[in-house]
Amino acid sequence: MSFRFKALDQRLVLTVAIAIALTACAKKQEPAAEAPAGEKPAAAAPVSDALEGQVDIVAWAGYIERGETDKGYDWVTPFEKDTGCKVNVKIAGTSDEMVSLMTQGGYDLVTASGDASLRLIRGGTVQPIDIARVPSYANVDDRLKEGSWHFVDGKHYGTPYQWGPNVLMYNTNAFKTAPTSWSVVFEEGKLADGKSNKGRTQAYDGPIYIADAAIYLMAKQPELGIKDPYELNEQQYAAVLELLRKQHPLIQRYWHDANVQVQDFTNEGVVVSSSWPFQVNTLQANKQPVASVIPAEGASGWADTTMLAANAKHPNCAYKWMEWSLNAKVQGDVAAWFGSVPAVPAACKGNALLTDTGCATNGFDKFDKIHFWRTPEASCKTQGTCVPYSRWATDFVAVMGGR
């Protein structure tokens, strides 16, 4: 990818410092836990329509910007001025952390990825929303409106926010041509620069990465009969774990911090890994020799949903934020900053920060090649019983430990 946006160079001189600043800001604004774990979910309809004066959100870094990192990127201040609802943000680094924070209570909204959303729904941690209170839901990409990671039993559990693919990022000095298969991260081999990929490869450090290995085996070993990378029977699951164990010696780091991965590609000799468009855009803006591709096997991806806590203390401000978040200008600005694709297609045109080519660069037309993150459950559609997420979580810790 070659997409570069206006303020990227300014904010990426000290990439890690940005992440620290975001975290520090979030800590200052973190609300105290307010809802006991056993408290019954609040009714979807508010007792009053009066705005409560604040909304507390658990979010990925970079998703809720108020211009503190770059003045050109601020979709919080206008919302606060318009509604009187102060936005407090708690940054989470992983989906597991998001689930933990929401389970503890004290937050109104969460920008949950698909590997967290079903856990939040099944656990009663979030509640269905009334889309009649979110008029802009009508503008959401039809491909996302009833995504299986947030639309359950005929109910909408939140509003789509942003989405994107997990791309294969590579150093163009190590690869003369773009790799066409995920084999370059799963199997040891000599690269175009004459060196092995061993110790120069990374993998995502979340249990959901098991699905990436399953996607590869769907094509490499079709006899396994994998139809959905999030629905694996015992035999399929065993084969996927074996692939991941064989991959382990190749790995320089299991990553989850995008900024750390940027540094590893810049200074630590890493040349190939699964990644997000954000890192690709960042490294290219810093004049690093990287590019990205979605290989022939396809890719996993994330479609994040703004979900409402079952015990939300500020539901009216929360609904105002959900409506605001689907504004085309906001959607485009978020996509430009984060390197994602807007949930509202209208945002792809006429946004000065994103530009009219930004959506295509960030993967808008790759939707059908993406297997979006979804919490694995024992009850599954493609076969009788599947290995649930609890097993994925336990076993992936062992894989990362070389066991």
Where are these regions (language model features)?
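Extracytoplasmic/periplasmic substrate-binding proteins
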Residues: 250-311, 346-362
